[in-house]
Amino acid sequence: MRRVLVAGNWKMHKTPSEARVWFAELKRLLPPLQSEAAVLPAFPILPVAKEVLAETQVGYGAQDVSAHKEGAYTGEVSARMLSDLGCRYAIVGHSERRRYHGETDALVAEKAKRLLEEGITPILCVGEPLEVREKGEAVPYTLRQLRGSLEGVEPPGPEALVIAYEPVWAIGTGKNATPEDAEAMHQAIRKALSERYGEAFASRVRILYGGSVNPKNFADLLSMPNVDGGLVGGASLELESFLALLRIAG
């Protein structure tokens, strides 16, 4: 049985002082959870997350990581640093990193390796732009991305890897794939994982949907057998909507 994960990607929003208030309110209002919750804020907020969320059911993590272990790499943040801050997760391969920073599948794979070396679970993002979907090539495009981003990546177990399918055309647009569209892609991803790591492994890897997830569509998405949670953007910034997602997840 795969445990539902609701992971909030805050992107470049909130200051550390704003986050402190948000975390304190979350801590006060958090219902008992059967599912798993995580918040992924900007790097400067992570020490605040460590301080406020340490003894709660809410995990936290980063939105990116360096592909390098350490050294003269100005502006980079290593997996070891994230581990020292208590991060449970880190996103790699988000479409905004691929688009605006030119990140390749090979670079994403190196980042995933660095995280696994430090015991941090990568949330590895894959997904197609609109023009690819309109050509009917969404599945082969996404699976090529998945295979390239997992090249040489050997998680110690299925719980050590999370995949997030994020159709690029649905991110921040208010559009979202239908539950049936999401399920079809998640099935294809799980099949590719089975070919790469074996069926027993693939059956236990969580595959999240990311793309304008909100309290209105989340229950329908979760009703699909291969949708194991959400990588949530805008709806994770408002405490009320994030709590609503957690209540839906159970």
Curated annotation (Swiss-Prot):
Pfam families: TIM
Residues that, per the record, bind substrate: 9-11, 172, 212, 233-234
Keywords (A to Z) from UniProt: Cytoplasm, Gluconeogenesis, Glycolysis, Isomerase
Pathway named in the protein's UniProt entry: Carbohydrate biosynthesis; gluconeogenesis; Carbohydrate degradation; glycolysis; D-glyceraldehyde 3-phosphate from glycerone phosphate: step 1/1
Gene Ontology biological process: gluconeogenesis; glyceraldehyde-3-phosphate biosynthetic process; glycerol catabolic process; glycolytic process
Molecular function as annotated in GO: triose-phosphate isomerase activity
PROSITE patterns, alphabetized: TIM_1, TIM_2
Disulfide bonds, paired cysteine numbers: none
Subcellular location per the Swiss-Prot or TrEMBL entry: Cytoplasm
Superkingdom as given in the UniProt entry: Bacteria
KW Cytoplasm (keyword) present: yes
Annotated active site: 94 (electrophile), 166 (proton acceptor)
Enzyme Commission number(s) from the entry: 5.3.1.1
Matches recorded under InterPro entries: Aldolase_TIM, TIM_sf, TrioseP_Isoase_bac/euk, Triosephosphate_isomerase, Triosephosphate_isomerase_AS
Swiss-Prot/TrEMBL catalytic activity: D-glyceraldehyde 3-phosphate = dihydroxyacetone phosphate
Cellular component, GO, one term: cytosol
Family: Belongs to the triosephosphate isomerase family.
Cited PANTHER family: TRIOSEPHOSPHATE ISOMERASE (PTHR21139:SF42)
Subunit-structure text: Homodimer.
Record function comment: Involved in the gluconeogenesis. Catalyzes stereospecifically the conversion of dihydroxyacetone phosphate (DHAP) to D-glyceraldehyde-3-phosphate (G3P).
Name used for this protein in its record: Triosephosphate isomerase
Lineage: Bacteria, Thermotogati, Deinococcota, Deinococci, Thermales
Gene: tpiA
